[in-house]
């Protein structure tokens, strides 16, 4: 227990020292806090282009934005990727290269057999008395629950493997910068 008190020559009663006037050697100063809270540029993506990464995400090159949301923009089939800024480069690269390695329970892929003989594959969410199935092309199909014959969960992600391969190393680094750095201002 740390007991910090003070007194003066005119008043010898011991009084607690106000914390605002007490600076311990291990205290983090406000300027250090500001520096610590500034985004750190991972060396793997240094020199890449945040704006090009955004274009890759929302464009036809990687088509990420068809299924995924970042900061309110994009599709609603796959997980919202806004919180990737809290993750490390290696784990994000693994998830991009091996989308079935870890699948969020809310985004499991299902094969849905309908009573009319059709079969739909994708992520499933409920909206009232309906199911909304999102496929790998980014399309949403709304069906009534009473139309479903059977649903079976798959062990594979709706996101196909190999989507990032055509980007090459520079395109992948640009995409990673967009996903891992909160804003273009922080990317500089």
Model-derived regions: residue spans:
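Short coil/turn segments at secondary-structure boundaries
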Residues: 32, 67-69, 106-111
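C-terminal capping alpha-helices of c-type cytochrome domains
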Residues: 12, 19-26, 118-120, 124-130, ...
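Gly/Gly-Pro-rich "capping" loops immediately C-terminal to redox-active cysteine motifs
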Residues: 73-98, 109-154
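The canonical Cys-X-X-Cys-His
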Residues: 60-71, 81, 175-182
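Electrostatic cytochrome c docking/interface patches
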Residues: 28-59, 89, 115-117, 161-164, ...
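Long amphipathic alpha-helical scaffold segments
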Residues: 2, 6-46
């Amino acid at each position: 227990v740390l007991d910090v008190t003070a007194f003066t020559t005119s008043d010898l009663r011991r009084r607690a020292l106000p914390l605002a006037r007490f600076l311990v050697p291990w205290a983090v100063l406000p300027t250090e806090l500001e520096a610590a809270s500034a985004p750190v540029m991972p060396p793997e993506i240094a020199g890449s282009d945040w704006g090009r990464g955004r274009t890759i995400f929302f464009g036809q090159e990687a088509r990420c934005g068809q299924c995924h949301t970042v900061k309110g923009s994009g599709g609603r089939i796959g997980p919202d990727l806004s919180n990737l800024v809290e993750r490390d480069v290696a784990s994000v690269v693994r998830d991009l290269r091996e989308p079935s390695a870890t699948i969020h329970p809310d985004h499991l892929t299902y094969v849905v057999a309908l009573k009319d003989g059709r079969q739909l594959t994708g992520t499933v969410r409920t909206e009232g008395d309906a199911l909304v199935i999102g496929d790998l092309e980014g399309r949403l199909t709304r069906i009534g629950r009473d139309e479903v014959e059977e649903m079976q969960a798959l062990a594979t992600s709706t996101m196909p493997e190999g989507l990032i391969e055509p980007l090459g190393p520079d395109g992948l680094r640009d995409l990673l910068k967009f996903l891992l750095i909160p804003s273009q201002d922080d990317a500089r």
